[in-house]
Amino acid sequence: MDKLFSMIEVEVNSQCNRTCWYCPNSVSKRKETGEMDPALYKTLMEQLSSLDFAGRISFHFYGEPLLCKNLDLFVGMTTEYIPRARPIIYTNGDFLTEKRLQTLTELGIQKFIVTQHAGAKHKFRGVYDQLAGADKEKVVYLDHSDLVLSNRGGILDNIPQASKANMSCMVPSNLAVVTVLGNVLPCFEDFNQKMVMGNIGEQHISDIWHNDKFTSFRKMLKEGHRGKSDLCKNCNNVSVQTEEQYDYVL
C-alpha cells in the first residue's frame, strides 16, 4: 500500500484579487466557486485527525486565502484537530497586515509564503520591512521573478508547452488537493479538475488516496508516462522529483 500524502492543499475559497499572466485565473474560471462550507472543512479535519496527519497543510488552490471570510475559523480548527500538522499560508500579501499576521500566527500558522506578483505595487513590502525579527522569521518573501513558471498542465499558451513526457513526477505521491466542494485532485496543476479521484463528503480521504484510480495514476507518473494522461501530457513542470516534503519549489 502506498504511503499517505505528506502535504494537503485545501481550497478554502476560489476568489483571487489578481489575474497574473502566469496563472490560469488570467485565461479561465474555476469550475467550483465560492468558499468551503465549514461543515465540510470539519469533515476533512475529522478525517485527517483519524490519520494523525502531521504533514504540511495549506489553505489555497488558485484563490487568495486571505479573502476567505472563515479563514480564522479554519486555521483554528486545523490546530484543534491536527495539532501535529504544519499549517502554512500561501498569499500574494495584498491583505496581510502586521496585525493579521500576528492573529493567524496565534491561531496556529507556522509560516507565510508571500509572493510579490507582477503588476500593482506590493503593499506588503512596507509591512515586511517593519516586522520584528520573530515575525519576520515566519515569512518567506519571494518575488515573482524567483518563481519557476509552469504552463499549468498545458493550460497557459504563453509559457512554453514543451512536454517532459518521459520524466517522472512525484506530486501525486506526496500531495492531495481538496477543492471548495470536497473533490480530491492529485495535483496542484489540475486547475480544470480533469482527474477527480473522489469526494471527502462521500468517502474518507484515506480511501480515496488508496483507491485504484489514484494508485494507478501515481504509478504511471512515477514511471514517467506523462503522455498517457490528458492532465500531464503537455505539462512542463518537472520540479518535484522526490518524495520529500517541501514548502515551495524554486
Swiss-Prot record:
InterPro entries for the chain: 4Fe4S-binding_SPASM_dom, Aldolase_TIM, BtrN-like, rSAM
EC number, UniProt record: 1.1.99.38
Result, substituting C16A: Reduced iron-sulfur content by 50%
Outcome of mutating C169A: Insoluble protein
Reactions mediated catalytically: 2-deoxy-scyllo-inosamine + S-adenosyl-L-methionine = 3-amino-2,3-dideoxy-scyllo-inosose + 5'-deoxyadenosine + L-methionine + H(+)
Disulphide linkage map: none
Effect the entry attributes to changing C23A: Reduced iron-sulfur content by 50%
Chain residues that bind [4Fe-4S] cluster 2: C169, C187, E223
GO function term, MF aspect, one: oxidoreductase activity
Note describing how the cofactor binds: Binds 2 [4Fe-4S] clusters. One cluster is coordinated with 3 cysteines and an exchangeable S-adenosyl-L-methionine. A second auxiliary cluster is also in contact with the substrate and is proposed to facilitate the loss of the second electron in the oxidation.
Function field: Catalyzes the radical S-adenosyl-L-methionine (SAM)-dependent two-electron oxidation of 2-deoxy-scyllo-inosamine (DOIA) to amino-dideoxy-scyllo-inosose (amino-DOI) in the biosynthetic pathway of butirosin.
Family per similarity comment: Belongs to the radical SAM superfamily.
Protein name (database record): S-adenosyl-L-methionine-dependent 2-deoxy-scyllo-inosamine dehydrogenase
Origin organism lineage: Bacteria, Bacillati, Bacillota, Bacilli, Bacillales
Gene assigned in the entry: btrN
